[in-house]
């Protein structure tokens, strides 16, 4: 089984009942950042880009791309601190974030660059013209839910610290069985 192989590789497994894996990762990454540790999160999940900072980077194994703060801007058109707003507008089917129909990545990045934040976009929604403006106004009530779903919690109570999760020595015997 996979879990036994992971343990045999010297990788600590951490499971928290009733807690999203993203929230566990976010909590550990922010604790590591606070402790001055560099963190690399291997994922192609867009919502993890909100965690990127001077010590937290993402590695997308599918594209082979490493994302630091500048890489997030290059890929999504907004800095990491605007990724929650970007995801709220664009949505993400893999994380069940509905977003606003007809608002794609470029439109969301344009609005966030122009208005500065989701709150400012909402406050000035009547100024946004065309069909996409109509869609935004028609979906204003669902934005708080999308925002909540897009936000990775970084305050989950965990009994492990980042230092406890250092890579261990592989169990060669277990791996060759």
Where are these regions (language model features)?
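A glycine-rich phosphate-binding loop feature that marks nucleotide/adenosyl-phosphate handling sites
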Residues: 164-169
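Extended two-metal-dependent nuclease catalytic cores across DNA- and RNA-processing enzymes
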Residues: 1-159
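Long, highly charged low-complexity segments
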Residues: 161, 172-177
């Amino acid at each position: 089984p996979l879990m036994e192989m992971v343990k045999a590789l010297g990788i600590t497994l951490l499971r928290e009942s009733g807690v999203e894996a993203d929230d566990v990762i976010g909590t550990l990454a922010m604790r590591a950042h606070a402790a001055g540790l560099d963190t690399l999160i291997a994922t192609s999940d867009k919502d993890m880009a909100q965690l990127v900072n001077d010590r937290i980077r993402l590695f997308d194994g599918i594209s082979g791309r490493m994302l630091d703060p500048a890489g997030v801007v290059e890929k999504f058109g907004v800095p990491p601190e605007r990724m929650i707003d970007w995801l709220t507008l664009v949505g993400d089917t893999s994380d069940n974030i509905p977003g606003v129909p007809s608002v794609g990545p470029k439109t969301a990045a344009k609005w966030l660059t122009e208005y500065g934040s989701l709150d400012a976009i909402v406050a000035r929604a009547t100024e946004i013209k065309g069909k996409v403006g109509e869609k935004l106004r028609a979906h204003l009530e669902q934005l708080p839910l999308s925002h909540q779903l897009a936000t990775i919690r970084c305050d989950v109570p965990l009994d492990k610290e980042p230092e406890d999760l250092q890579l261990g020595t592989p169990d060669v015997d277990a791996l060759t069985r």
